[in-house]
């Protein structure tokens, strides 16, 4: 990893998820000579919409989680470190290693972290579904339950948003009747933000796979073998996956930034309110009056828009406002099944599954990686 030739003139991007990585790659295409620094502590980018296919071994690790040193070429300096403090006035960043960096433009795209709502036992006795460690843990649970085939064993998924619904469908297919799968949701319906078509198809898929859906149910405590509900009843489990919420993961910033609904408030061009050269994207940002969904497609589009905005600033022009283009929603409903709406399509079943996966594979960062992955998938048909 090399340092940019002039750190004080660099574009520094904090966070290598969808927003950060796509900003870096798009900016390099627009301004090949621009010094770009990407700060990300992990060694792999994670394409989370395809994490379900990694759980079922339908895709391989290199396809879903490519290494940053394979995605980034010599035009982008990757620093594998963690930001501990950002000083806006003097435009410096302090890293966990003790190093300091200056910037000309700053992009914050640090994503989110799980929200346990302070419920006892969630951190100690549950798994999330956000990274490769979580995938490995769930694979171990599934293998163990498959070998035991204990009729009293069961998995509980808490939270019936997209992650919870997709995960419950996938695990029900993989466990193949060796244990029960239960989806617990505090609200009165699954997928409250989805289209009616996707919600209905998901409900039908859950029923077909034997997933028990328990609505209007809140968890008050989690132990190694039980989930205690708010009404006092107890559910036994052999593994509990928590997908019930997230919080923005915002680094320490001085002076304190303006917040909107607990996120960094941004103007129409994604610059932080009160700043001329600092941007915030994805799950950590919010535009007053414009509730963008917390999704990969928003972060990817914001990455492209931020790259264009920075390119404009560096030649003395004002950025254009960000315009989100809703391209619809695609949901995995288990092995070989999916539902999607958007771009003029309303589709469910095996064809939707193939279209969803092909669409995501071609969106993998780095053209060669996307083509390799799509080619590998086509050869497996």
Positions of predicted regions on the chain:
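FAD-binding core/adjacent interface of flavoenzyme oxidoreductases
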Residues: 1-9, 76-154, 241
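C-terminal, flexible cofactor-proximal segment of oxidoreductases
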Residues: 6, 308-381
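Glycine-rich, N-terminal phosphate-binding loop of Rossmann-like dinucleotide-binding domains
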Residues: 16, 110-111, 117, 231, ...
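An active-site-proximal "capping" alpha-helix that borders the catalytic cofactor pocket
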Residues: 36, 295-315, 330
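A Rossmann-like FAD-binding core segment of flavoenzymes
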Residues: 76-86, 173-268, 319
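A short alpha-helix-loop-beta-strand transition element characteristic
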Residues: 80, 146-151, 180, 315-326
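FAD-site-proximal beta/loop scaffold in flavoenzymes
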Residues: 124-151, 234-301, 308
